[in-house]
Structure formats: structure tokens, C-alpha cells
């Protein structure tokens, strides 16, 4: 019997150590809109999660105040955004430079070009180029991989 068909992805949840710092950072970097009606509060009235909508991204991002989880996943790279083409990556380089955010150079890797930077909790975020036809149209290029670079393969993500 086949599995029931999924209808999509609801949201992405990222653990953070400081909700306000991360909310402000994602707002500055991505022009993220804070969807306040979805704020999560505990029984004591403490806000512990916020939902953001990033321009150009259909899936909302949840930032959840979870310091232990954020500390345990330093160096993890759970989210890979589509930036567009090579010119779009250069626009992101300029944007991140203007904000003073450290980032990788534009890297040519297995699945195209990418730019990598970290959020305030040291979660690695990737911006990738994608060809016409989308992700499934990517032709892998194993000769172009740069697996030993500190940006492309943080220690946490190295295989045994």
C-alpha cells in the first residue's frame, strides 16, 4: 500500500537563544515580516516563538526560543534558500557586506553556486542558484565540489 500523499511543507522551525535578537536579525537580513498573530505564548504569558514570512519564500519560518537546542546545533545547516542566478548571489554578497555579516565567497559546489552565512546562533544558512526548471533540473558536478572548505563543511556536518 502506498503512503498517503503529502500536500506540502507547513513551516520551518529554527531554535534560537535570544528571540528578540534573532527576530531583528532575520528582519534586517531578509526583510522578514513578523506575523504577530501567530506569536506563541506559554501559560505565564511569555512569548517563546514567532513566525516570519520571508519575501519570495512560500514557507513561513518559526524562530523558537530553545537555547539548549540552539547550542546543540551550532554549525548545522538546515535551510537552503533559492537565490536565483549568479547575479542574485552577487547582490546578496553586497547586501551582507552592507550589513557587516560575515559570509563565504561565492562557492561552486556539487549542485551549483552558493553563498553561506550564519545567523546569530551560528546556524549556517545557504543561498543557492537554481537553473530553469527548478531544483530537480540541477545537474550534479562532483568535480566542482569543495568539501573541505570551512563554509561548505562545518565540523558538525562532517560524516564519520
PLM features: residue spans?
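Generic beta-structure capping elements
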Residues: 55, 64-66, 130
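Conserved beta-strand in the GNAT
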Residues: 61-64, 126
Amino acid at each position: 500500500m502506498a503512503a498517503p500523499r503529502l500536500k506540502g511543507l507547513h513551516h520551518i522551525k529554527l531554535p534560537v537563544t535570544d528571540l528578540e535578537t534573532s527576530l531583528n536579525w532575520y528582519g534586517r537580513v531578509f526583510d522578514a515580516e513578523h506575523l504577530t498573530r501567530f506569536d506563541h505564548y506559554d501559560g505565564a504569558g511569555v512569548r517563546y516563538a514567532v513566525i516570519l514570512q520571508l519575501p519570495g519564500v512560500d514557507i513561513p519560518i518559526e524562530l523558537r526560543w530553545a537555547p539548549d537546542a540552539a547550542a546543540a546545533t551550532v554549525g548545522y545547516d538546515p535551510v537552503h534558500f533559492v537565490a536565483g542566478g549568479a547575479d542574485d548571489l552577487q547582490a546578496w554578497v553586497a547586501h551582507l557586506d552592507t550589513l557587516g555579516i560575515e559570509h563565504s565567497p561565492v562557492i561552486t559546489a556539487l549542485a551549483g553556486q552558493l553563498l553561506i552565512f550564519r545567523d546569530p546562533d551560528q546556524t549556517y544558512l545557504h543561498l543557492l542558484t537554481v537553473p530553469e526548471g527548478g531544483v530537480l533540473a540541477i545537474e550534479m558536478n562532483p568535480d566542482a565540489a569543495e568539501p573541505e572548505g570551512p563554509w561548505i563543511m562545518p565540523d558538525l556536518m562532517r560524516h564519520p
